[in-house]
């Protein structure tokens, strides 16, 4: 029978007519020739290349060429000593349209039915038996150079699939697949695997296998393909696709991992790629390779250095041991497959089994996409992934899925977990939790953190409620039964809040409800108990998340955490308690520093806007390098008429800011009552520019009753006078060539320029690029933020409300009439810096008086020129002192004490008191300079006779 079958096979082969296969043309991105010069070759390699080229020429694989295309060619020597010719086709591949793979993945030999006989064959020189399309041959030309160019180079082009061409594997699979299609149709009950040029045939009986193989030989030969006779396998053990196949078992082929070559990222990437390829056979869980996977972190440069750690060395040893001992099983085609899910450490592990026979392992990637992945979601993802794998292997869903959950937990998972619904969508099999009794799974390291045990999804009854908060200043805090503020090194509000939650979990060893205004922290705390934490390049974040997970898992009592929106106006105790926690970490000082860095607002403005002390506000200004250098000197006291209400009297001038370029003419207007400033940058200072500026002022400040300017031509022209008359505005000018008449606006010019310099050289704002934008920022600071001495509101508030809120307004005072040299009683209308406006009486015009010619009126008054008593004067002094302190005046306490001691001597005249005060001051100071320490000579001095620095000179 055997001889008869052999003769039948031979006759069948002899009768077959070989038809040349039809070539598959390539698609090109360009028809422009690609030419890469051939590099010189050593004499030995050049001789070998000539021999190989002649051999391929005789076989008809190449032909002479005059193609404008060229690719370099070279040879390598095999271990056997034979030479192999290769072509560098990288440049040509770049202009070929890819066909795409026909087999995205290797077939699994575990699907070969157990106990079926096998035959494995290898096609000989498969690429060289498949022709190229005629129009494509010239694209694969190469050149064999001559030494010293002593003769013309020899050029050839490929007529068959060249090795290294982008689409050669796809074309090869297509040709072999066509040849095997008749075999698959005729022997549909046989199991045939084809991968590139390796073919495996399995049949239920040997006779059927021989018949199938005989027919396969004929079809392969008919397609112009040849079987390598020395690579036919007919007995166990079979070697196929890196596996050793036996009648029932499948083992990985024995390999040795070379550790001495592992030096770069590329080396470790290749190693782990190979290990991952055989992991479904080896059964190495993800947690057992975590140190090897960790080596891949860091620099993405393939040549970046990497080092094999002792922990990773142990894991490689485990891989080698598994290669020696691991095995899987061939399946029974009539029995269903099952999926087992084990709750292993790090991430779950899946196993495909048939009865108790292991078919394949399934794992999740070591790194996840999300920062936190719940363990239940990982189980669902693994189920969905392995279901697709089983369908790919055998075309069917698993018959049963075994999970480490109770029936109630499975029911809750279907209700609450979206990932669970996706992973088990359309599954009609059995979901069970009873594992088969076998020892092959006992080595797995299991975890108990599958579902939350400590974290609750609903508020706890009869539990403490704690509110947490964190700030970007590094402070974390909680409030509840007790309050605590924690200083952290973090500059992130979320990280500080994370520290606050961790501290609460550590401090309260009892059931608690935590309320946080960070949704990010709340979600992280809810998930962290059973989550796989994704590795981050930020070590601080890794440490915080790991500490949070450890803290939660160590707790003995449950907790609930929820989110509350911060800074809302909602009523109720929760909002108030959250605000209390926010107050513990919010820093008005930091906000004040940030505003000053942006606008360079003065100390009074900072104190008014933020809850900071005078010292803190002054420290901010004093520590600012720009404000320290550009601090304006104290202006000498004097009188310049001012308005008694907003828009009563303006002063206007033009100053120059060279840095503004062609817009360097800055027109400035200041309201003399509120000190509200408005300025515009113009290209000149003519009447048209002045009118343009005033219209801008009207839009912001309103229309004034009176404007005072200098005698510039733009202000004295008839056109300007006509413009003012249209708006019903009266106009006055100062003394020509005397700037003192315009002292207020001149001072404003200096203030505005100084503010511009501060913000330009020391400001944090980078968006103020145009001159007008720079002006607007300076004006905003001066009008809406700064508060000046003797005032309690900003210039903008004074201008809009008409209220200055000076503490001396409405008070009775004595004022000195310099014409008559007498002291009169009046009432303060407004009080400014070094000046005051006094009402002498009914039906009399107000009088502007320097503050050195004023004193407070106190009842009873015996003599307007003499002090009433030491007690009265002391009371007056304390009143003024209190006001000075409010205005930020820094007094020398020792001098104050000296002058008070002199006043309290109860002498008959002020001169005698001054003499005593002067004497004490000299003795105390050890200084003989009478001008510096002499007390004020005016009885009832407005400064209490004790502040020569404020008086500057004798009040009389």
From Swiss-Prot:
Biased composition (Low complexity): 869-879
Region (Disordered): 865-890
Any one Gene Ontology molecular-function term assigned to this protein's record: RNA-DNA hybrid ribonuclease activity
Span of the annotated motif LPQG: 161-164
Residues at which Mg(2+) 2 binds: 469, 582
Keyword Hydrolase set for record: yes
Catalyzed chemical reaction(s): DNA(n) + a 2'-deoxyribonucleoside 5'-triphosphate = DNA(n+1) + diphosphate; Endonucleolytic cleavage to 5'-phosphomonoester
Family: Belongs to the beta type-B retroviral polymerase family. HERV class-II K(HML-2) pol subfamily.
UniProt function note: Early post-infection, the reverse transcriptase converts the viral RNA genome into double-stranded viral DNA. The RNase H domain of the reverse transcriptase performs two functions. It degrades the RNA template and specifically removes the RNA primer from the RNA/DNA hybrid. Following nuclear import, the integrase catalyzes the insertion of the linear, double-stranded viral DNA into the host cell chromosome. Endogenous Pol proteins may have kept, lost or modified their original function during evolution.
Domain-related comment: The LPQG and YXDD motifs are catalytically important and conserved among many retroviruses.
The protein, known as: Endogenous retrovirus group K member 6 Pol protein
Species per Swiss-Prot/TrEMBL record: Homo sapiens
């Amino acid at each position: 029978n055997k001889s008869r079958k052999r003769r039948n096979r031979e006759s069948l082969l002899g009768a077959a007519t070989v038809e040349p296969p039809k070539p598959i043309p390539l698609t090109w991105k360009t028809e422009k020739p690609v030419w890469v010069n051939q590099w010189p070759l050593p004499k030995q390699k050049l001789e070998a290349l000539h021999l190989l080229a002649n051999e391929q020429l005789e076989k008809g694989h190449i032909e002479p060429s005059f193609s404008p295309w060229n690719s370099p060619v070279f040879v390598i020597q095999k271990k056997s000593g034979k030479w192999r010719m290769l072509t560098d086709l990288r440049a040509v591949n770049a202009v070929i349209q890819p066909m795409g793979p026909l087999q995205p993945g290797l077939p699994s030999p575990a699907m070969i039915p157990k106990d079926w006989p096998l035959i494995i064959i290898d096609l000989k020189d498969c690429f060289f038996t498949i022709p190229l399309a005629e129009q494509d041959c010239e694209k694969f030309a190469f050149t064999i150079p001559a030494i010293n160019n002593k003769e013309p180079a020899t050029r050839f082009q490929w007529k068959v699939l060249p090795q290294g061409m982008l689409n050669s594997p796809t074309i090869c699979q297509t040709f072999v697949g066509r040849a095997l299609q008749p075999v698959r149709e005729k022997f549909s009950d046989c199991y045939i695997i084809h991968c590139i040029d390796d073919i495996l045939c399995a049949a239920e009986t040997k006779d059927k296998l021989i018949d199938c193989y005989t027919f396969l030989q004929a079809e392969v030969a008919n397609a112009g393909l040849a079987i390598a006779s020395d690579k036919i396998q007919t007995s166990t053990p079979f070697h196929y696709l890196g596996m050793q196949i036996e009648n029932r078992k499948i083992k990985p082929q024995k390999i040795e991992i070379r550790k001495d070559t592992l030096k770069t990222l590329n080396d470790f990437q290749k190693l782990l790629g190979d290990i991952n390829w055989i992991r479904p056979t080896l059964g190495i869980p993800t947690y057992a390779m975590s140190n090897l996977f960790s080596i891949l972190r860091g620099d993405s440069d393939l040549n970046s250095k990497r080092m094999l750690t002792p922990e990773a060395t142990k894991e490689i040893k485990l891989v080698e041991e598994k290669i020696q001992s691991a095995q899987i099983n061939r399946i029974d085609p009539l029995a269903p497959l099952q999926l087992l899910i084990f709750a292993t450490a790090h991430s779950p592990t899946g196993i495909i089994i048939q009865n108790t026979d292991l078919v394949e392992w399934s794992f999740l990637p070591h790194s996840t996409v999300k920062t936190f992945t719940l363990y239940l979601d990982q189980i669902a993802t693994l189920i969905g992934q392995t279901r697709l794998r089983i369908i790919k292997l055998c075309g069917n869903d698993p018959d049963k899925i075994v999970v480490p959950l109770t029936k109630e937990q499975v029911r809750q998972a279907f209700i609450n977990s979206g990932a669970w619904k996706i992973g088990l969508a359309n599954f009609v099999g059995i979901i069970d939790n009873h594992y088969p009794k076998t020892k092959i799974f006992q080595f797995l390291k299991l975890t108990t953190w599958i579902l939350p045990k400590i974290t609750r999804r609903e508020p706890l009854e009869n539990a403490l409620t704690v509110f947490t908060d964190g700030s970007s200043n590094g402070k974390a805090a909680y409030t509840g039964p007790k309050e605590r503020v924690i200083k952290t090194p973090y500059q992130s509000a979320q990280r500080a809040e994370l520290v606050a939650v961790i501290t609460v979990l550590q401090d309260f060893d009892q059931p608690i409800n935590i309320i946080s205004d960070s949704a990010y922290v709340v979600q992280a705390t809810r998930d962290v108990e059973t989550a796989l934490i994704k590795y981050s390049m930020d070590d601080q974040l890794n440490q915080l998340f790991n500490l949070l997970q450890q803290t939660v898992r160590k707790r003995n009592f449950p907790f609930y955490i929820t989110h509350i929106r911060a800074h809302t106006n909602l009523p109720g105790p929760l909002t108030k308690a959250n605000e209390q926690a926010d107050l513990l970490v919010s820093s008005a000082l930091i906000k004040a520093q940030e505003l000053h860095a942006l606008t360079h607002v003065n100390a009074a403005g900072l104190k008014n806007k933020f809850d900071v002390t005078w010292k803190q506000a002054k420290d901010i200004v004093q520590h600012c390098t720009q404000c320290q250098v550009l601090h304006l000197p104290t202006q000498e006291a004097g009188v310049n008429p001012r308005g008694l209400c907003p828009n009563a009297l303006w002063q206007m001038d033009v100053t120059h800011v060279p840095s503004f370029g062609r817009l360097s003419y800055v027109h400035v207007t200041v309201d003399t009552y509120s000190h509200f400033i408005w300025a515009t940058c113009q290209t000149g200072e003519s009447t048209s520019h002045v009118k343009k500026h005033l219209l801008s002022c009207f839009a912001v400040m309103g229309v004034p009753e009176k404007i005072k300017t200098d005698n510039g031509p733009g202000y004295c022209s008839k056109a300007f006078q006509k413009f003012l008359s249209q708006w019903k505005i009266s106009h006055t000018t100062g003394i020509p060539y005397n700037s003192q008449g315009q002292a207020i606006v001149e001072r404003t010019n200096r203030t505005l320029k100084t503010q511009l310099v501060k913000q330009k050289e020391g400001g944090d704002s980078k968006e103020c690029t145009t001159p007008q934008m720079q002006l607007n920022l300076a004006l905003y600071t001066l009008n809406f933020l700064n508060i000046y001495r003797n005032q309690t509101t900003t210039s903008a508030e004074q201008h809009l409300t008409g209220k200055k809120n000076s503490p001396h307004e409405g008070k009775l005072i004595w004022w000195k009439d310099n014409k008559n040299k007498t002291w009169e009683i009046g009432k303060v209308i407004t009080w400014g810096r070094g000046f005051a406006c006094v009402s002498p009486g009914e039906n009399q015009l107000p009088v502007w008086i320097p503050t050195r010619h004023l004193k407070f009126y106190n009842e009873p008054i015996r003599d307007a020129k003499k002090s009433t008593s030491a007690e009265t004067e002391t009371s007056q002094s304390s009143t003024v002192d209190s006001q000075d302190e409010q205005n930020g005046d820094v007094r020398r306490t020792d001098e104050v004490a000296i002058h008070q001691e002199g006043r309290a001597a109860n002498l008959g005249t002020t001169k005698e008191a001054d003499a005593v005060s002067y004497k004490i001051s000299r003795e105390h100071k050890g200084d003989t300079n009478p001008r510096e320490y002499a007390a004020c000579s005016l009885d009832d001095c407005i400064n209490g006779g004790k502040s020569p620095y404020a008086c500057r000179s004798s009040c009389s």
